[in-house]
Amino acid sequence: MSTYYSINNSENIDPNIIVISPNENSIFNFVFKSEQENTSYNGEYLEDIYYNLLKEEKEIKLKPIYGYMSKQKDINEQMRAILVDWLIDVHYNFNLKKETLFQAIWILDTYLSYEIVPRNKLQLVGITCLFISCKYNEICYPRTNEFIYVTDNTYNIKELLNMEKDILKKLDFNILAPIPIQFYDILAKIFNFDSEQYNLGRYFMESHLIDYNMICFSSSIIALSCAYIVMKFFSLKDYKNLYLINDKNNDYTSQENIQNEIKESARQLCFLVKNLNESNLKAVKSKFSLEEYNNVSQYCEDY
């Protein structure tokens, strides 16, 4: 992984299943057994959690606005990509929870949707978003001065704390929203992904954070498309069940729309990962080339 710096210087699925819900039409009726999971796990909670997240996703009012970059006067998509690539690197080196990263980028894009930011403050905004996300997600997190250090001391603690206040005020303290990794973790349990399969999906999921244009897709669609890519890559049979999960009412038109969204999102993700393999933004690829992530980024180099 790269060092810190200031960015202002420019197989078949197990056929055994467990019935877990009284609703016969629910895809959540079928959760595949996994020897690695606690067999006493009550799968009914998966359905409740998933649909509660889906409900929150549809009802949330303050969220990133696709197209916000057109209103920014001093920053652009490439600057955001460099910032996010750097934040992924910092997040890994700080050894933070996966949720912390996704929430930080959600806060970043939401703030940038409503606030004009000069380029000399963009890195400050980014590291402050990670700082805020740490406070919510982490039991123990780096000291304030460590967040300053990773910017090569471009800013000071007072500036960080003032930016924290400004972001929280602008977002009216609404910093929580369903994020892709929450949906994906449930899908991985439903379809019994092993470590290799799970990490391949995460590789695509973290890659999507870099591309500003992926904001047009909801968190649940991003998660479904990552699971779709995994299931197609490993030739898993039940990928079509992904089209049903977001449609609780078994509406054919809705399922068709969801299917189209998943396929388009997956297409863009594959294109993005291919381009990242050839770009200077190496944080995600380097991270997922490590053995702890099953070296999954190497799968995509010639695929």
Regions picked out by a protein language model, each given a short descriptive name:
Residues 1-303:
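Acidic, serine/threonine-rich low-complexity regulatory regions at protein termini
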